[in-house]
Amino acid sequence: MVLLGALAAWLWGAKKLPVRILTIASLSVLVIFVGYSSYALLLIRSHANPPMNQNAPDNVFSLGSYLSREQYGETPLLYGHTFKSSVMYQLQPDGYNYDILRRPGKTVYKKGVKTSPDQADSYVAKQEEFKYEMTPKMLFPRMYSTAGAHPQAYLEWINATEDDLPSVETPVVVDADGNTVQSMAMKRPSYLQNLRYFFNYQVNYMYWRYFMWNFAGRQNDLAGEGQANRGNWISGIPVIDNYRLGDQSLLPDEYGKGNKGHNVFYMLPLLMGIIGLCWQAFRSKRGIEQFWVIFFFFFMTGLAIVLYLNQPPLQPRERDYAFAGSFYAFAIWVGMGVAGLWTLVNWLMGNPEAVRDGKSLPKNGKADPAKSHKTALAMACVTLAVGLLVPFQMVSQTWDDHDRSGRYTTRDFGMNYLSSIAPNGIIFTNGDNDTFPLWYAQEVEGYRTDVRVVNLSYLTTDWYANQMKVATDGAAGLKFSAQPADYAYDRLQFSYYDPENMVTDTVNVFTSLDDLYHNPDATWKGARVMRMPYMYIPSNAEAAVKAGVISERELPAAEETIDIALYRDPKNPVGGATLSQALSIDMIATQAKEGWNRPAYFAMTVPDEYYLSLSPYMRNTGLAYQVSPLLNPDGSNETWIDTDKMYANVTEKFRWGGLDKLGKDGDIYLDETVRRMVTTHRTAMADLAMACLLYTSPSPRD
């Protein structure tokens, strides 16, 4: 409406305008509206409530949050903290005590929780979490993340140690007016070190390396983090590659020429692109105008994205796909390189007028037949060489690592996860590679739609928890005691442990969860507190037998309770419980209470810290661990194997994605991600084989 109003006012004020300007204005507005109308698809799809409905953008506020990527947090761009910054403190009015300096977050609107289906929609104003004031800060902060191993990785990329970082005098305590009360010297990267990381990692390694993959060559398909033997760009010219990376002929075959991701273009596409770029830029006034159009396309989809993303090191996967638009732009210049070569050959053949004027005739208008024939022959050779040799070289190098024929590993391995689950079961997953293949198998192939896939990363959000209660095609909604009002508005995002007021007795799981959800006293400075982290789930063992979770002969060995100890869990030593942990415990306990009709599993690839201290109660049935009322028979705190179920699943239900087909070694391309999936299967097979050797009877409980 604002855009239309501004356009109407402008047209009214300028009553006499050329038709050309009116046409451009109307077409521009039309194109803008067509572009923005694509966002309507998100709202329409979300209102249909499909099984996969990320962020549930069914209203303007959640749509805004979705488009601004708020779930990924904020990244400092122009001014902000570094990885050496710490929180500032504010002096209290009494003049003695301090408190952490926090700034109130912005007010956001969220969809109100309905207490009945016929209640009208409402929107609630909520203040975002307080933002802690950090010190020291710097301009253009590139090294800011304190997560995991990021601080050490920053230092490695700038070839420095903690001692090499300079100290700056910075305020650490301020009064209510912002005046410095106390300052101290604190470490902070220098601006030179900051720029060194920016160019070494973000620009060179995370952009130009990918650029050179496409126009110079690639060492192998292994994800790298700066190593000389993983994922670098190469040219195929030994004098260049050996100087940069060491003697490439000494690499093991799987790291060098034996790796299908090993591609060499001898920099021919790069040279063609540079020639095309120069030809367009210096051709004429029209050429330079067109050059700037392509250049901004190249820059805004390449280096501008580098500036915006501000990527920390140790990325979980290669990010070359983020810059595909930039590579498309350079490919335009590669095509123009043919015309540039035509001009270059004309100049070399002694026809400078053609270079300047773009014509084949000299200025006097008289053509030299011999020279024209010679030029035409040379140009035919150049066109043939460029038009065939360079593309053929690229195709011959990249065909084998782009050919996916005969490879169905992603589909089949996703089905194998689902095949490990009993009917109507629940499987908890965590990462992309153990979630999206399962969703594909269910939604596209229609395979095992009775299984409910629960992604633990998404389960930290209220919109995903709400979706878990909704039935999908083939699977009923999940039952758990928490209601939308209990976890709405990030209320249970993180519940702290309070050792001083903690209940150390082991209580019923629903007593603990009810206290967390509803007890008004279970708070600390506005945040929820889990006061009862030691809990038990009644095993309901006889119902587990009827549901097929355990066998009749295993019933005498079943435990009366399944014990959970979240606090001081050695595999997850954190200071509180997440919403994901609370809801996953709730789901497991509820299905056990209701007769184990929806047995719970954890995908084999889920890290141990997500197991809720249930490891000794979990048995491998293929590619998933089933929660059962049986403890590990060897008395350890680790998972174990249900040999009966796993053997049946592996031998009767598993698929192998084409890897079981007869053919020459290397017929099917297996990139690093697929090879990791294959390794997961191999590990499962080895564990099963070892279990079968250890237990001579059909079941270890016999």
Give residue ranges: language-model regions.
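Residues that form or flank phosphate/diphosphate-binding pockets in enzymes
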Residues: 436
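ER/secretory pathway lumenal C-terminal domains and tails of membrane proteins involved
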Residues: 1-318, 322-323, 330-424, 439-697, ...
